[in-house]
Amino acid sequence: MSKLSPARKLALDVLMEADRRGMYARDVLSSRASAKAIDQRDSAFAARLALGVAATQGILDELLDQFLDKPKKVAPRVRMALRISAFEMLYLHTPGRVAVSQGVELVRSGAKSAAGLANAVLHKVADNVENFATASDVDESERRLVRLSRLMGLPRWLCARIMASFDTPEGVLNFAGNLAPAPLALHENAFATKADPYISQLVAPVFPGCHAPVDAQVTVASGVFERAAAVASDLNAQLIATAATRPGRCLEIGSGRGTKTYVMMCQAKRAGYDRQHTALDLHDRKCDQNLARLHQAGIPGVRTVSGDACELNEVLTSFDAMLGEPALFDTVFIDAPCSGSGTMRRHPEIPWRLTEDDVTTKLPKLQLTMLKEAAARVAAGGELIYATCSVFDEENTQVVDAFLASPEGAGFTVVPLSEAQILQLPEYDYAKNLVTLRQNARGLFQSVPANADSYDGHFCARLVHR
């Protein structure tokens, strides 16, 4: 009997807690003291297993169910343990004897009576995993789609949509990097009154405030995020937040816990902009988290408000009452709810929670409603900036075009994001170059996670109110 590794045990506990509480595995990992108590290598391996299983659970079940007599009767903890071993064999190429032995012990740790079942099933997985990976078990007419689906760890409908979104096989295979950890970038606090000991050791920023990439384990262990000396923010997301930073009054819609709020306020300080920032989110809790971090970081000048962005007149009642007329903003920045298809490495549960109807109908309808509602709050000469972390045209260009064709969008014009005011400052030249590289002929920004080392998929449209 082999000894169960602490990393595999931690991964199982994290996945079960995430499943039981309806949380993301990454959030459970971050909150678990046990993840910090074990050896750093074990902790990293546990995270790799937990996030990998969360990302590929449907594919793993497809593999396992071939060898289970009664798949629906398998206890949740037993199934999760089997998934971990199947993930190791299918995606990490762990030798079968190791994965089977550890898988049996993992099952035994919570259900001794199921150890025999685990041994039989996992041996069959080990014998058949290569055929499964190459989709030699399916009809030739479906083989390419199924093979890519299994390679990427994605539902077939989502894989088919990705295939349809890119012109070349290479473009599709870019998403094979979905199972690799995403690179970490951070944005440093421009309001800090003294140098941070960790940030001061880093090389010069890529562009003002942005350090990328940074070592994830070293950075997290440094405590830089806990003391609000920086926020973790994808490089492409920082480019969008930077370009959206302008003088005057800004309404940020969909602020969440305030990562882009933090970035925009820091960039405004660096650029010397006089600015009043209102951060709106649907949830009170996220507004509170945003304000708490801003306060800790010493970042002033932000007001938060909670409410439904599809009902802005109701949400902004107090603003309107103070002014005696509808409040207008120089910038309205919408960080829209979306499929998250550009950030699946960071949120691995996304593919298995999404439906095709979400991408084609429900989300675009919501996004268009938010754009129309926000348009009425943009001052003449102001900017309406629409951003998603999706790579799908239905949520991006199609939503923008539908808005421009509507009565609410009639007074707006698409202008290149690279022409944003802040990007014309000399110190932001490199940021401007990065934005330009990600723009199409219309000036719409779209990044794609091109490989395991690249940053996330983001979209942004800059619309000026003439």
Language-model regions: role of each:
Residues M1-R466:
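S-adenosylmethionine
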